[in-house]
Amino acid sequence: MTIPTTVSVAPADEYPADGHTMTDKLTATLDKAGVRAISTDLWGIFFEDISYSGDGGLNADLVQNGAFEYNRADSIDWSNYSFWRKIVPAGSFAAFDVLTDNPVAEENPHYASVEVEQAPASLENIGWDGMVFRAGETYDFSAWMRISSNCEASALPVTVALIDDDGNAIAEQDITVDSNDWRKQEVSLTVSGESNAIVVHEGALRLTFTTEGTVDLDFVTLEPRTTYNGLKHFRPDLVKALADLQPRFMRFPGGCITHGLGMDNMYHWDRTIGDVEHRPHNFNLWRYH
């Protein structure tokens, strides 16, 4: 049996913000011979973004608010710099701003702008109650960066470092921002050792701006390279724990993420595909982002 149907399709570079969807044709072929009854007694799992089950949980990214989209309108305790520390040592001078002109993605327009008049100065992300680092693990860092249009420098160095419980760097790499256009910077940092034992319980990611100038940055991420069966961007120990349950089905989305506070805040599957930069950030009723 062939059933012509219409599905909503959103290309990676085009996401309707008004709730309307674009359409494309999809033809599905169903084989009656393959139909079988479904048991009414199945063991399954249910996903709702509560108790940090999404970001801070299954999501392997250790950075919280890496897109600088947290804001007071979503939660009275939030700001665009929530979970970031601004570090300006004695003798240094720097200003930290949040801008929206010419962003990486219109869907998530806010980005940080760090103007350093007397170096050094740093931004430090503490993740979810601190970052856990393991011996022998490699952590992949990425961020979109550019030299601000009001800065005359042609190249600005930035040091990326993993910070331990005592505030010391246990791995670091230097990158160079050398364009007035947004470019994705990527670097890997490996913690010494081979045991995979936890060596840092309340660590952080530190970005240090070592010369005078202004750098814009957005979509900062840090992920451990270890995966479960090659499944990237998911925390391997939690995925394994779910797989060990041997569920026959998964309910998603579940709970109040389904309806949210209204049409604009409810779960829209078509806004969760494509490049992550173009997926609109949102908050939920459990006060997660």
Task: Please describe what each predicted stretch is.
Residues 2-289:
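Extracellular and organelle-lumenal recognition/adhesion modules and their flexible linkers in secreted
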